[in-house]
C-alpha cells in the first residue's frame, strides 16, 4: 500500500511518499497541521484524480495500490486527529488496516464500497470480479471506468484526471485483492457513516445495504454513480463544517423554536425534575449549561436550583439575545463550540438538554468534563437515541449517528458512577408530511442534513410517509427518542 501526503500546488512542488517519514524535506512545504484526512482510494487509482480536492484545514494523505496491505503509518504519527474517508475497494482496505493502527481516529466515512468486496450478497459478485480480472486490458479498463462514472460527460471529465498506472499493474492489484480477501479474517471495524450511490454499477446498492447492517452507525444515500465527483469533494474538501451548518440552521429558527419545540420543552421539564430527585438538596454554586439555545432549560435551572453562578453556552452567538432577560451578574453567556471551549474548573454541574447528539466527539467531551468538575461534581444531560426521527431516516437515508443508552453509559462508566438513566419514545402527530418538514425546519433540527428537494422527490416522500407512518386516518407520526443520564464524578 502506498501513502502520499498532498499539498496545495501553490505551496509545494511535490508530494511525499511514506518513506520520507514525518519530516518535510520538500522545499516550500507548509507546516503540518494538527489533523489529517486519510483517504483510501479505489482499485487502480493513484493520487491524480483527487489532487484538486484538498481539505481547507487538514493535511490530505492518500492510500492506494492494494497489492499489499502493509500499512506504514509513519506519515500519520504527528497528528492529533485523523478523519478517514474511503471509497470503493478502499473501504475494504481501510477496514483491514485501521483496527490495529492505534491512530487517533475522529470520524470514518465509507463511500460506495463494503468490507466484503467479493461477495454475492455484500459486495461485487465473484463472477463479475473474476470476469473483470480475466478480461482486463486497456479497452475493458475504459469500459469499466465508463460504467464507474455513470454517464458519458462524467467519464470524459474523469479521463482528464485519470491515473496513469499500467494495466498489468492493475491486474496484479486485482489478483492480490482476491487472494488477500480469501486469506484474511473479516474485519469488525465499525464505520460512522456509509454513503451509497443508488445508481452504482460497480458495488450494487442492495449489496451495500446488506453489508452495512452491522458495520456502520448511519447510512446516507444519493442519486448518483459509483464515482461521483460531487460526493467525493463534499467529503474530502467540505465547503462548510457540520458545526457551521448547525449554527446557521438553529439561528434561522430562533423566532419559531419556542413555539414548535414542544418535545424539547417536555424533555427540559423532565430533565429538571430528574435533577431534583437525584442531586443532593444543597444549593449549587457553579453550573454550566452547554447548548442553551433560547433558554428553555436555563430558566428551569434558575428557578429550581438558584445557582450562585450559571454559565450559559451555545454554538450560536445570536442565542445571547434570546437569553438576555436572564443575563445578570450571576448568569453569563459564553458563545462557541462546547467541544473546544474551556469551562471553569471546580464546576458542580455540567448539564444540557437535547444537545449531545450534535457532538462530533462526545467521549472526549466526557473526559474534559471530568477534569473540569469538582470532586463531587455531576454531568447530567438528555440526548436522543437510535429510534429518533426514524421516519426521516428510513425515507431519506439521512440522520445523525445516534448512540444507544447502553453505549452512552458504557462510555461514561470509565470516569463516572451512573446515578440514573432512562429513555422514552414520544410520538407527535401531524396532519400531513409537509407539516412534519415544516416542524423540523422551524425547530432547526435539520442540522447537518443536506437533502435537496425536487418536486418529484417531495411528492414521493409525502406518498411514502403517508403509506408507512399513518397511525390513524388523516394524520402521520414523527418519533422522538429521548435518553436521560445523570452521572457523578468518581
From Swiss-Prot:
Cite the GO molecular-function annotations of the record: carboxyl-O-methyltransferase activity; malonyl-CoA methyltransferase activity; S-adenosylmethionine-dependent methyltransferase activity
Record CDD domains: AdoMet_MTases
Catalytic activity as recorded in UniProt: malonyl-[ACP] + S-adenosyl-L-methionine = malonyl-[ACP] methyl ester + S-adenosyl-L-homocysteine
The pathway it acts in is: Cofactor biosynthesis; biotin biosynthesis
Q: What is this protein called?
A: Malonyl-[acyl-carrier protein] O-methyltransferase
Role according to the record: Converts the free carboxyl group of a malonyl-thioester to its methyl ester by transfer of a methyl group from S-adenosyl-L-methionine (SAM). It allows to synthesize pimeloyl-ACP via the fatty acid synthetic pathway.
Mind telling me which SUPFAM superfamilies this protein's record contains? alpha/beta-Hydrolases, S-adenosyl-L-methionine-dependent methyltransferases
Which HAMAP family does the record cross-reference, listed alphabetically?
BioC
User: EC number(s) in its UniProt entry?
Assistant: 2.1.1.197
Family (UniProt): Belongs to the methyltransferase superfamily.
Q: Which residue pairs form cystines in this protein?
A: none
Q: Which NCBIfam families match?
A: BioC (TIGR02072)
**Gene3D superfamilies for the chain:** Vaccinia Virus protein VP39 (3.40.50.150)
A Pfam family annotated for this chain is BioG
Q: Which organism is it from?
A: Bacteroides fragilis (strain 638R)
Q: Where is this region: Unknown?
A: 1-248
Q: What broad class of enzyme is this?
A: transferase
Region (Malonyl-CoA O-methyltransferase) residue ranges read: 249-490
Q: Where are the transmembrane segments?
A: none
State the encoding gene.
Answer: bioC
Q: What is the lineage of its organism?
A: Bacteria, Pseudomonadati, Bacteroidota, Bacteroidia, Bacteroidales
Provide one Gene Ontology biological process annotation.
biotin biosynthetic process
Its keywords, alphabetically, are: Biotin biosynthesis, Methyltransferase, S-adenosyl-L-methionine, Transferase
Amino acid at each position: 500500500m502506498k501513502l502520499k501526503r498532498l499539498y496545495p500546488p501553490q505551496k509545494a512542488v511535490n508530494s511525499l511518499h511514506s518513506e520520507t517519514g514525518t519530516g518535510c524535506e520538500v522545499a516550500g512545504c507548509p507546516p503540518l497541521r494538527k489533523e489529517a484526512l486519510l483517504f483510501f482510494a479505489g482499485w487502480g487509482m493513484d493520487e491524480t484524480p483527487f489532487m484538486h480536492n484538498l481539505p481547507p484545514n487538514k493535511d490530505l494523505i492518500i492510500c492506494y495500490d492494494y497489492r499489499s496491505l502493509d500499512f506504514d503509518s509513519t506519515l500519520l504519527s504527528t497528528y492529533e486527529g485523523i478523519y478517514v474517508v474511503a471509497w470503493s475497494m478502499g473501504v475494504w482496505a481501510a477496514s483491514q488496516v485501521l483496527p490495529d493502527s492505534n491512530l487517533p481516529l475522529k470520524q470514518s466515512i465509507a463511500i460506495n464500497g463494503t468490507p466484503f468486496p467479493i461477495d454475492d450478497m455484500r459486495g461485487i459478485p465473484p463472477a463479475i470480479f473474476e470476469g473483470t480480472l480475466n478480461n482486463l486490458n486497456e479497452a475493458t479498463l475504459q469500459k469499466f471506468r465508463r460504467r464507474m462514472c455513470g454517464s458519458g460527460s462524467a467519464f470524459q471529465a474523469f479521463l482528464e484526471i485519470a491515473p496513469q498506472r499500467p494495466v498489468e499493474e492493475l491486474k496484479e492489484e486485482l489478483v492480490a485483492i482476491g487472494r488477500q480477501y480469501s486469506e484474511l479474517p473479516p474485519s469488525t471495524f465499525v464505520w460512522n457513516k456509509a454513503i451509497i450511490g443508488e445508481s452504482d454499477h460497480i458495488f450494487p446498492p442492495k449489496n451495500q445495504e446488506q453489508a452495512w447492517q452491522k458495520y456502520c452507525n448511519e447510512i446516507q444515500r444519493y442519486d448518483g454513480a459509483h464515482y461521483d465527483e460531487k460526493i467525493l469533494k463534499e467529503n474530502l474538501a467540505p465547503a462548510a463544517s457540520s458545526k457551521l451548518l448547525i449554527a446557521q440552521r438553529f439561528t434561522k429558527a430562533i423566532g419559531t423554536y419556542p413555539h414548535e419545540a414542544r418535545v424539547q420543552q417536555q424533555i427540559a421539564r423532565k430533565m429538571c425534575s430528574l435533577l431534583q430527585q437525584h442531586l443532593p438538596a444543597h444549593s449549587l454554586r457553579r453550573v454550566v449549561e452547554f447548548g442553551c439555545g433560547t433558554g428553555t432549560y436555563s430558566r428551569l435551572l434558575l428557578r429550581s436550583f438558584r445557582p450562585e453562578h450559571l454559565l450559559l453556552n451555545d454554538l450560536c452567538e445570536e442565542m445571547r439575545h434570546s437569553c438576555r432577560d436572564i443575563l445578570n451578574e450571576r448568569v453569563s453567556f459564553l458563545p462557541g463550540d462546547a467541544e473546544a471551549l474551556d469551562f471553569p474548573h471546580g464546576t458542580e454541574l455540567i448539564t444540557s438538554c437535547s444537545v449531545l447528539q450534535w457532538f462530533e466527539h462526545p467521549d472526549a467531551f466526557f473526559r474534559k468534563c471530568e477534569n473540569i468538575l469538582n470532586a463531587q461534581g455531576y454531568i447530567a444531560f438528555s440526548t436522543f437515541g437510535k429510534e429518533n426521527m426514524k421516519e426521516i431516516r428510513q425515507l431519506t437515508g439521512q440522520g445523525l449517528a445516534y448512540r444507544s443508552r447502553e453505549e452512552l453509559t458504557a462510555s461514561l462508566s470509565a470516569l463516572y458512577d451512573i446515578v440514573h438513566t432512562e429513555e422514552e419514545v414520544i410520538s407527535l402527530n401531524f396532519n400531513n408530511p409537509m407539516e412534519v418538514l415544516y416542524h423540523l425546519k422551524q425547530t432547526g433540527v435539520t442540522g447537518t442534513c443536506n437533502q435537496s428537494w425536487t418536486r418529484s422527490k417531495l411528492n414521493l416522500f409525502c406518498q411514502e410517509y403517508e403509506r408507512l407512518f399513518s397511525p390513524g386516518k388523516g394524520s402521520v407520526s414523527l418519533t422522538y427518542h429521548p435518553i436521560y443520564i445523570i452521572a457523578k464524578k468518581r
